[in-house]
């Protein structure tokens, strides 16, 4: 403030018309008068600053800028909460991910996620406390299948053909459907941090590039409402693959719901959620319909530390159908334990195991397959049992090169009411090599193997080679 006043006063004095001086002595008198005026103003400013409780002689703060380097995890986590309003303190160690499911996940107090600890790319709306970001990435996938894989765009093991006449047909595919756009807004409020998140990709149809909604939600404090990840799933445990589908034994579901998290402190939270129900049944006929009379209810306990995290989730469901001759109801539900753990300097171990009855909707391989329960010949509804899981390991060869080794499996119990060609078991294996020469640029190669077994014991398998190029808009 003082420097500004002095500059203005000096400019005004020297800009005034200069009158002719009779002698050098008169000029010196004018200079002394200017000095006295400036000293008087400086004393007055000192008095005003003392009255405001500031030190009159304190110099402006100098912010030093260090050379570009890989910042420690703690520094990155602190930077996000300090620079972006409406953000809680992140805890998990930073990690890389091509699909980056963590960035869209809802978190207590809208904390930064492990794939974006600095929350880069936000800019302020003038005159408000709101900051916004437009993000996403463009991704091109080149895919070569040794045999028919069923789904040409994603490696979904439950869709592998078994006993098909065209089973041995190889295929090449090139697509950019994983390309996505996101919009995010954050701001602090008197009731907690406010976050709005919107995300789309182009997996809306199998034969084109139809826009698909992935996330659309708002979160105030620890209360979430909208459409996005189920509270039951754990986005931070999903492994780093070029393939978009990931292991079939992982918990995965996009659904509308309301969540509320209770923060116990020290990285411990408990989340309760009510989510849109959908009884996905096998054995239905023209005169039977699935009914949903209660929301799916989930309860999730989570522990986060600087070495990783553990999450235990449970879901309870009401499954049912109505028919012309009979109706029936069954309880469904299950649990999942998942987590991550740092190994060495940058390596990471990821895992998840789940099991239950009527849980197919909540798995990556079987969501939408109609295998939560089956209607028997006697009209009774039978909730189908399943177990599954995955494990993944990320190894950094150098700061720019990394590899992932992943295995997943999902198994459903045999049931006489199911069709002979219904799902029995799937296996998923991946090895990849990923190069990220710059934060916004990633490319890699991935080898995938998948196997599907039907209820009658018949099997089919295939191998896929996938290459990907990805450009992140902000990273």
Regions found by a protein language model. Give the residues of each.
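Extracytoplasmic loops and strand-loop junctions of Gram-negative outer membrane beta-barrel proteins
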Residues: 116-120, 161-168, 240-244, 282-284, ...
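N-terminal periplasmic/intermembrane-space "pro-region" immediately following the signal or transit peptide
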Residues: 21-148
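Detector for outer-membrane/organellar transmembrane beta-barrel domains
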Residues: 304-423
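Sec/Tat signal peptide C-region and signal peptidase I cleavage site
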Residues: 16-20
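Outer-membrane beta-barrel "beta-signal"
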Residues: 435-437, 461-475
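Outer membrane beta-barrel
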Residues: 118-158, 162-280, 291-294, 298-309, ...
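Transmembrane beta-strand segments that form the barrel wall of outer-membrane beta-barrel proteins
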Residues: 193-204, 272-276, 310-318, 402-415, ...
């Amino acid at each position: 403030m003082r420097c500004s006043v002095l500059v203005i006063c000096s400019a005004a004095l020297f800009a005034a018309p200069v009158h002719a001086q009779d002698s050098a002595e008169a000029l010196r008198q004018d200079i002394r008068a200017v000095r006295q005026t400036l000293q008087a103003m400086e004393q007055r400013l000192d008095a005003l600053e003392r009255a405001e409780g500031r030190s009159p002689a304190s110099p402006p703060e100098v912010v030093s800028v260090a050379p570009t380097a890989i910042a420690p995890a703690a520094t990155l986590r602190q930077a996000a909460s300090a620079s972006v309003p409406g953000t809680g303190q992140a805890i998990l160690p930073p990690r890389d991910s091509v699909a980056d499911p963590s960035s869209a996940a809802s978190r207590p107090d809208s904390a930064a996620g492990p794939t974006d600890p600095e929350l880069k790319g936000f800019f302020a709306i003038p005159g408000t406390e709101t900051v916004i970001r437009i993000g996403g990435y463009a991704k091109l996938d080149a895919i070569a299948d040794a045999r028919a894989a069923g789904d040409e765009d994603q490696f979904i093991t439950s869709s592998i053909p078994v006993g098909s006449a065209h089973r041995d047909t190889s295929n090449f595919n090139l697509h950019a459907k994983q390309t996505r756009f996101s919009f995010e807004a954050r701001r602090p409020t008197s009731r907690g941090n406010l976050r709005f998140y919107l995300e789309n990709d182009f997996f809306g149809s199998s034969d084109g590039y139809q826009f698909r909604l992935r996330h659309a939600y708002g979160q105030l404090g620890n209360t979430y409402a909208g459409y996005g990840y189920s509270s039951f799933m754990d986005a931070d445990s999903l492994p780093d693959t070029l393939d978009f589908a990931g292991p079939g034994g992982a918990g995965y579901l996009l659904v509308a719901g309301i969540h509320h998290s209770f923060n116990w402190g020290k990285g411990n939270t408990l989340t309760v959620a009510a989510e849109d129900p959908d009884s996905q049944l096998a054995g239905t006929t023209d005169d039977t319909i699935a009914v949903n009379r209660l929301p799916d209810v989930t309860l999730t306990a989570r522990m986060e530390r600087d070495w990783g995290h553990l999450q235990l989730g449970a879901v309870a469901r009401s499954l049912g159908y109505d028919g012309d001759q009979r109706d029936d109801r069954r309880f469904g539900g299950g649990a999942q334990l998942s987590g991550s753990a740092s190994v060495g300097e940058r390596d990471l171990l990821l895992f998840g195991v789940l099991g239950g009855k009527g849980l197919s909707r909540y798995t990556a391989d079987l969501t939408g397959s109609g295998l939560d329960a089956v209607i028997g010949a006697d009209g009774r509804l039978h909730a189908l049992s399943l177990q599954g899981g995955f494990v993944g390991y990320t190894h950094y060869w150098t700061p720019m090169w990394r590899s992932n080794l992943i295995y997943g499996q999902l198994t459903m119990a045999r049931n006489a009411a199911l069709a002979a060609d219904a799902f029995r078991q799937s296996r998923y294996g991946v090895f990849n090599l990923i190069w990220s020469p710059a934060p916004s640029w990633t490319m890699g190669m991935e080898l995938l193997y998948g196997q599907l077994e039907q209820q009658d014991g018949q099997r089919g398998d295939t191998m896929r080679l996938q290459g990907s190029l990805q450009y992140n808009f902000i990273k």
